């Protein structure tokens, strides 16, 4: 087998047949041997296969209209934001594909396509995170969410900005090539606004310092990421990741920005013939629809940071009708989710229309938007979710408006009496 000669003292590789004298190293296994050359060849084959599978490729990149229609299935309302995101995401990945295919590289007149990161403004619970998650799901690219409030400038207590990239690498199962075409959503970016419009003399490590630290990775750079997260130290190995093709979607509530927009817009409404808009008219429209980069600078974002987020779009507060749609219309609507949970116990769950309206009203009162709907549903259904799995006599649960408004018990509809057929002598008996 692997031994040559009568003495049995000369061994050979079980794969290529070379003797131990012809190779540098021969490694023994249970009844087999492999040489260093075959190991190198195996590594090369595996690396080539991984390189082929790690690149995110589409047979055909979805067009903006197709992206918009996919978002429609999961996100209610917010049409302007969905259109802006559809176009921005399409252009971004078209640029990525052009780069992979050469894209005119080497030509003197070659045009370098710049990256278009996105700034998404809007109140909490209006669908910012869901929009980003749904985009990543459609495109089948790695996706990571980061909270800007946890970040600090390098060298201070808190998370380095490179830890955001580590989350993306982890989402890609440590496949760096795949991570380099992913999407990162940074939430609560308004919380790292500097304290005043003018540059700070003292060190603002969790505000302006974070914005400064994010500039390079937003624009596109090769970053060194510690594999285990945490702080960098000189004796550890780093993962190198190029952020040139990573799409950054940055979101925040920007509470108070509407006053800055209003004061700027109000200043233009002075003089004869000027268009005067009441506060009600401004509130009726999207409060961030008229935002300008200078408004964001006044809010506390540094100009360099805003410059790296060229696509500005916003989502608005959800009204009662939109919240009702969220409860029942999307593919993964909350009502459908809870109906499925009850169905697994063999029980139907029904909501009266007025009960759903009462749930929407509660979310508006709490000012939690769509995010608060699940919490309200949990409160409404908690007692019945505790009781029903232990009972075999309940066929249907009906949620009435009083259940939501006055905390009364839901209506439990018993199962129909079970009939025993002719073969059993025509007897009838009721289920327990």
UniProtKB/Swiss-Prot annotation:
GO biological process terms on file: cell division; proteolysis involved in protein catabolic process
Annotated binding of Zn(2+), by residue: 13, 16, 35, 38
Entry GO CC: HslUV protease complex
Region annotation (Disordered) ranges: 411-432
Presence of the UniProt keyword Nucleotidyltransferase in the record: no
GO MF annotation, one: zinc ion binding
Keyword Nucleotide-binding assigned: yes
Skewed-composition ranges (Basic and acidic residues): 415-432
Family (UniProt): Belongs to the ClpX chaperone family.
Name of the protein in its database record: ATP-dependent Clp protease ATP-binding subunit ClpX
Organism: Streptomyces griseus subsp. griseus (strain JCM 4626 / CBS 651.72 / NBRC 13350 / KCC S-0626 / ISP 5235)
